[in-house]
Amino acid sequence: MVLNYIWIAFFVIAFIFALIGLAMGDTTIFQKIVDSTFDSSKNAFEISLGLTGVLALWLGIMKIGEKAGVVNVLARALSPVFTRLFPDIPKNHPVMGSIFMNIASNMLGLDNAATPTGLKAMQQMQELNTKKDTATNPMIMFLVLNTSGLTIIPTTILAFRASYGAAQPTDVFIPILMATLVATLAGIIITSLWQRINILQPVLLATLLGMCAFVGIIIWGFGQMDKDTMNTVTTLASNMILLGIILCFILAGFWKKVNVYDAFIEGAKEGFTTAVKIIPYLVAILVGIGVFRASGAMDMVIQGISWSVEQCGLNAEFVGALPTAIMKPLSGSGARGMMLEAMKNYGPDSFVGRLSCIFQGSTDTTFYILAVYFGSISIRNPRHAVACGLLADLAGVIAAITVAYLFFG
């Protein structure tokens, strides 16, 4: 129901703003909005088309891992933690391995691997779901972990900063890591409170503290490197790990006498089917966002926030980067465009340019993930997924602003 109201609101607000624009003399406003519907629907299909090959590849690899027993080994290894974080999932269920693969891919910034493994996890959780059109607690927790977007290697952002001539492209690395860690911890805590999961259980608490320590070690390690070394290490590590996972699954299949090629083809067929299923959901959410943005409502929201901050007598320097923060839950490509625009207009080494990069790396595209993940299994009632995801995003935004002032203010 929440997505239903949000989607309707996109169009109603857009129409109201279009009428205001027309009254102020903008006779092209309705054409802009209508054009955005065609552009957004085309973009949604192109995204799905682009996902088809990637989904086929990674679901094929995952199928090899399933038949070789690798996924079950991962599930058993992670059972002590995941059975407490996802109490409704049976112990040692194969979905635990898929969840781990997805989280690991996200942490390494490997989006091409994260989405297929995430969709595989959703399909496995749907098999346990007694109400097929309603999201379960494990699905929501998993979704929030994705929307909070814990990434320890933000390779793309660092590459963009280098291309825009930043003096130190990697100077946002530690701030991004700190902000995304806050967003992830906030997402886990908020969702756990909502689902009445006791996060003070020794195993869970130790895991969260261990995660903080792990990120701290990475921050310290990369802090000892110069920018060229950091870029080389991050790129090399992420790609070596990715290729290592593929090789591990294939060799495990060979060792277990699995017909690796046939298993891959079987999984790849599932990838094509999944890509087709998500098209209507992507079209719906991207068209709604496109209409909202084309009407000028997004600009008005940003101007309103800027005015409110200034009236309170606070430092409003961060407002220039807010378009990236506001766009991020709605559209990944839109937020990326806002980040690049901020670096172009203000400079990559300006406060706004750096903060926009931290915003881009601190959370993920909540509504896109909702549309793709829930759409792949035909979930229509997301329950508290939207609220928890957006609250985690808000925590990430607040953390990003705070960290930016600490490092660059």
Residue ranges and their predicted role:
Residues 5, 32, 44, 60, ...:
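Hydrophobic alpha-helical context, especially transmembrane and signal-peptide helices
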Residues 12, 58, 67, 107, ...:
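Short glycine/serine/threonine-biased micro-segments
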Residues 30-127, 256-345:
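Membrane-embedded alpha-helical segments and adjacent helix-loop junctions characteristic
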Residues 35-38, 45, 94-96, 131-139, ...:
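Hydrophobic alpha-helical segments, principally membrane-spanning helices and signal/leader peptides
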Residues 100, 104, 139, 230-233, ...:
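Generic signal for short, ordered secondary-structure residues
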Residues 113-114, 121-161, 166-196, 322-409:
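C-terminal transmembrane helix pair
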